[in-house]
Amino acid sequence: MAGHLVNYGKHRTRRSYARIKEVLDLPNLIEIQTNSYQWFLDEGLKEMFDDIMPIDDFQGKLSLEFVGYQLLEPKYTVEEARQHDANYSAPLHVTLRLTNHETGEIKSQDVFFGDFPLMTKQGTFIINGAERVIVSQLVRSPGVYFHSETDKNSRVTYGTTVIPNRGAWLEYETDAKDIAYVRIDRTRKIPLTELVRALGFGSDQDIINMFGDNDSLMLTLEKDVHKNTDDSRTDEALKDIYERLRPGEPKTADSSRSLLYARFFDPKRYDLASVGRYKVNKKLSLKTRLLNQVLAETLADPDTGEVIAQKGTKVDRQVMDKLAPYLDRDDFKTITYQPSDQGVVTDPIELQSIKVYSQVTPDKEINLIGNGHIGKKVKHIVPADVLASMNYFLNLQEGLGSIDDIDHLGNRRIRSVGELLQNQFRIGLSRMERVVRERMSIQDTATVTPQQLINIRPVVASIKEFFGSSQLSQFMDQTNPLGELTHKRRLSALGPGGLTRDRAGYEVRDVHYTHYGRMCPIETPEGPNIGLINSLASYAVVNPYGFIETPYRRVSWDTHKVTDKIDYLTADEEDNYIVAQANSPLNDDGSFVDETVLARHKDNNIEISPDKVDYMDVSPKQVVAVATACIPFLENDDSNRALMGANMQRQAVPLVNPHAPLVGTGMEYKAAHDSGTAVLANNAGTVEYVDAKQIRVRREDGALDAYNLMKFKRSNAGKNYNQRPIVTIGDHVDVDEIIADGPAMQNGELALGQNPIIAFMTWNMYNYEDAIVLSERLVKDDVYTSIHIEEYESEARDTKLGPEEVTREIPNVGEEALKDLDEFGVVRVGAEVRDGDILVGKVTPKGVTELSAEERLLHAIFGEKAREVRDTSLRVPHGGGGIIQDVKIFTREAGDELSPGVNMMVRVYITQKRKIQVGDKMAGRHGNKGTVSVVVPEEDMPYLPDGTPVDICLSPMGVPSRMNIGQVLELHLGMAARNLGIHVATPVFDGANDKDLWATVKEAGMASDGKSVLYDGRTGEPFENRVSVGIMYYMKLSHMVDDKIHARSIGPYSLVTQQPLGGKAQFGGQRFGEMEVWALEAYGAAYTLQEILTYKSDDVVGRVKTYEAIVKGEPIPKPGVPESFRVLVKELQALGLDMKVLGADKKEIELRDMDDDEDDIVSVDALAKFAAQQEEKKAHEAAAQATDGKSANSTDDKK
């Protein structure tokens, strides 16, 4: 027997073909959300308050300090929040201390800071009753970046950017003449040396002493001449910089000093964040920069004088290991520079400096200047950073240092929920700070309390804005559990502070070698967002700095054996190592079998001897995301089709009776477990009671846990969200075990589709171009039947003319239409409704006339319907018919919170049972998608030799050109699994190979080619060739024909052009575009074309007259002028062109005469004419009433 048995949960055993030992369990798949939010509650919030507080007033009399905060119990449970359209949130209370420095009085007070949305256990938020997900964002990390460009004359220019988390950008660049410039905050450039002078190093000699006689520096000093000799060099530089930053304002050295200080060295205005400080220190420290350089001086121990490294030594790893402890010391090779008193910062600056030889001219000595030892707590930039980064920049021309790749995942980091929330909260708090300062100066200092100073409005508003309308706060994709899980693990490069679709080039979207094990190279949307929206790889985790780490098995450096010690590496750490592939064959003791090993180093794939290998992959599936890891035989599919397969699994509709795949990958259990749709046991114990709605588990400590299941709830996508117990009374359950399946799950595994018998053969041309031929059995036995629940709402509001009323008494409606309404006019649960049926009877007052006193009295006594009302009932929309599943009524009397002006709200849920039908979209897991073209009676389908009819026929032409051969392998293995009565697991890149597949086929007693003779169901004759028949997992996707099919009868028209609207949602028409008009012109179908462009479109009068003619059975009159032509004429007239329309007799045609449009009449005679028309009209009306209300004339109809 090929393969071995593996248990997935307690309810499923699969035969696994994996050969590679599982060294590491997958992490919790939604921890990127939950951990980040937990960090925010534990630390992030406090950090924010500590940043903003204490707040002092302008005179320094009062100060407001932060003491602590607490979140109280949430007002609603998760379920109640869903029902009430409310937020699942908890009140945030902050303790503040107000100190009066004049009197020494201290007041402490608890201040309510608004309701703060809480994250559910599943990693989502409930905002206004809907589940939302905050997508993590991929952004450039703050830090120092160096880049180079080659111009058309092959000259290399260099550039540097210092990117903060917030604050001004600092950029250095060289031009074609090698002069170095600096830009502050994207303004005009000034010579680099001016910034050095402004920092307090005024003379040329000071600058040369610090940086050495670099060519570019010398050229820059020549350009930077002393223009105004009255000022010192430092003052002149300061004024120059001020002029660039604030052009047009009077410049003084003092104002420039304070401006520069505020731009870069003020922690309130400039923030690198902890990650920025970490990146800057890492880039500028001598530890990283000395590696592979040749020393131009001898380095000795400062205490003993013992030589550590001789002059001329090349610093390799061994030398660096000796040097590292010294480089961490404050007294090793440290030079202190004292800026002049005129500089921006006057404190002494400590730099670490070591001489090395140039890579370009080998005997030239170069200063390497590091930024010293700046603590993690310093979140702003300091002069040492500026000088060290300038030194790095100048040294690039000498071949020292490296250029940064912006798409490298060491330079891109993830902002998860916690950080995004923190940034939003900071915005709210800083707005609040301004208000507090103003109030401090206004209020009486003796009596003021913290409560009076605080205005929480800006804080509440910024949080509400973030959850309600941020690009990263998204309505959760709840089609099935995999869609949910993937949405929470999504990484987006879009959003505030990120890229925009149109600006993102090819490089950003492309797969980068650092994606390996961190981001999935396959799962990304097709279309404009390709490569900008990615998915976290299955084993990847996010470290505290926001960089993605992936696990590797450590290879012992002395024995060269692979150990089970796991290290998580970021992308830039991994660049230092050589990593072997997960499928490298190992001996039992962990040593490599082969003489050479396939390995990766940076972006190279290399063959190398085992003693050079540092790490080894933990698993072959660490490269891909969860959805991709659910595709069996992924290694045999072309990547484009695998991309479609991964994306389409998320669109699979949960079926009534789901089945887990016969051929799985072993990922199904973990995906279902972590998605949050299943019910997990919180504690171990024994099941005491089970029914469809509740499971009760007796814990080991004697307490009882009750788990309520969700039954037939509507998911965000309008699908049926239903949970079913999979345990029975007496079962023992463990902590975290699945005790109830969610939607699209079976026995604790993901079950997105079914396992039908599929034949690759054409059938009467019905499966041409990816069409699918289905057997009627799939319809009859409800194999692909799904339940859909739609929610409809009706509100009774107060209007100016009186309140709307929910009632059975609806004007002009027969008893037949009211048969399913109760006494209040609300439809009963269980009623079957069709399109156009009334769900909630509602009338709105028309209020034509004001009631007289007598009428009001009569109305008060007898409650007579003296008032005119309009029927504004809620009706079933087109295609919305089904069975009423639930009705919820919310009223003020019952204590429900309703929006202002609403007296009552009724919510009706309609359930539809949709069987598979022609037009529905289906797909396998390999990107093999199609639409159903015909449903064939079971007896007409081709059948196997044992008489079993095939369920689906797919076109064999869909395979070769698309190169997704995985589907064929799955087909054969699926058939073998069915015959053997087993489920199999074939993990990605480590699944069943050729030998395993054919061994299993043989074991199942199938033919050696895996094919079968098929017989035509209509004639009973065998087909000429043997056909590939087997079991393939096939899903029904949420693109169903019922949601798309649409036809217009009489519907709304666009306001300006008077043409019918478009689209199903607007009940619109089909667009007859320019090319369709050409087609009719080519056929000479003049009359057809004329009516399409007039009656059926925007000839307003013609429409009405045509309708009238059809009703009366008269011939249809000639069409008039289309409204859009009038719009064109009016637009030309508006441009001042005297546009007139002439008839065939060259006489002007008055457009308004043609269609009786009174609105355009301005002149006095025209008004007189209008009055005469009105008189005539009244006479007509009287005559019409006399002849027993025959149809009114067309102008009146139009009115």
Curated annotation (Swiss-Prot):
GO molecular function: DNA binding; DNA-directed RNA polymerase activity; ribonucleoside binding
EC number: 2.7.7.6
GO biological process: DNA-templated transcription
Tagged with keyword Transcription: yes
UniProt keywords, alphabetically: DNA-directed RNA polymerase, Nucleotidyltransferase, Transcription, Transferase
Positions of the UniProt region annotated as Disordered: 1175-1199
Start-end of Polar residues biased regions: 1188-1199
Broad enzyme group: transferase
InterPro entries found in the cross-reference section: DNA-dir_RNA_pol_bsu_ext_1_sf, DNA-dir_RNA_pol_bsu_external_1, DNA-dir_RNA_pol_su2, DNA-dir_RNAP_su2_dom, DNA-dir_RNAP_su2_hyb_sf, RNA_pol_bsu_bac, RNA_pol_bsu_CS, RNA_pol_bsu_protrusion
Source domain of life: Bacteria
Pfam annotation, one family: RNA_pol_Rpb2_7
Keyword tRNA processing attributed: no
Catalyzed reactions per annotation: RNA(n) + a ribonucleoside 5'-triphosphate = RNA(n+1) + diphosphate
One cellular-component annotation, GO: DNA-directed RNA polymerase complex
CDD domains: RNA_pol_B_RPB2
Family affiliation: Belongs to the RNA polymerase beta chain family.
Subunit (UniProt): The RNAP catalytic core consists of 2 alpha, 1 beta, 1 beta' and 1 omega subunit. When a sigma factor is associated with the core the holoenzyme is formed, which can initiate transcription.
Chain's role: DNA-dependent RNA polymerase catalyzes the transcription of DNA into RNA using the four ribonucleoside triphosphates as substrates.
The protein's name in its UniProt record: DNA-directed RNA polymerase subunit beta
Naturally occurring in which organism (per UniProt): Lacticaseibacillus paracasei (strain ATCC 334 / BCRC 17002 / CCUG 31169 / CIP 107868 / KCTC 3260 / NRRL B-441)
